[in-house]
Amino acid sequence: MKSLLITGFEPFGGEEINPSWEAVCRLPDEINGYSVNRLLLPVVFGNAAEEAIRKANEIDPDVIICIGQAGGRSAITPELVAINLRYAKIPDNSGNQPIDEPIIVGGDNALFSTIPARKIAEAIEALGIPSQLSYSAGSYVCNDLLYTLLMHFKGSKTRVGFIHVPYCTEQGKEPSMSLDIIVDGLKNAIENLDES
């Protein structure tokens, strides 16, 4: 069986829950031949990626998918690209607020996701769940995590991707999506990880 590491984030920005972790917790333990290994990450620049890499070193996953909250988006949005930039409009959960700093000095300006992000977006949309490909993972901890993982696993067997999800309805913000629908979308994403 293939191994999947799927991560979600703790709450941040004054929220009491984070739909990324709530959804990850509701996924089954096996999907489409992948064993599902979950990991909760801190919303802290650098630390999130360090913890994900530490876990990946333990379980040697075939694929890593990171899930994050994108408040204001109304669709599930697989990310195509990560950029070598840290810019925080609000502090992370440790109080860090970098402004226009590189994630890795001398690193590539941008790196493309190594999962089939466009195919995943189209497959989720075909289920009747709002989804679209995103060309910007932002410049906060989500992008920081994706970029660092893509750099770390560049040229290895481990494929890396990121999927943003909207607020869940339980947060009382708009636009939002029910957790059940978010979970269905993520299950479908995992079912479409392989190109064939």
Where are the language model's segments positioned?
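N-terminal catalytic or cofactor-binding beta/alpha core of small enzyme domains
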Residues: M1-A137, M151-G155, S176-I181, G185-S196
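Active-site-proximal C-terminal subdomain of hydrolase catalytic domains
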Residues: I129-K154, V160-P166, E170-Q171
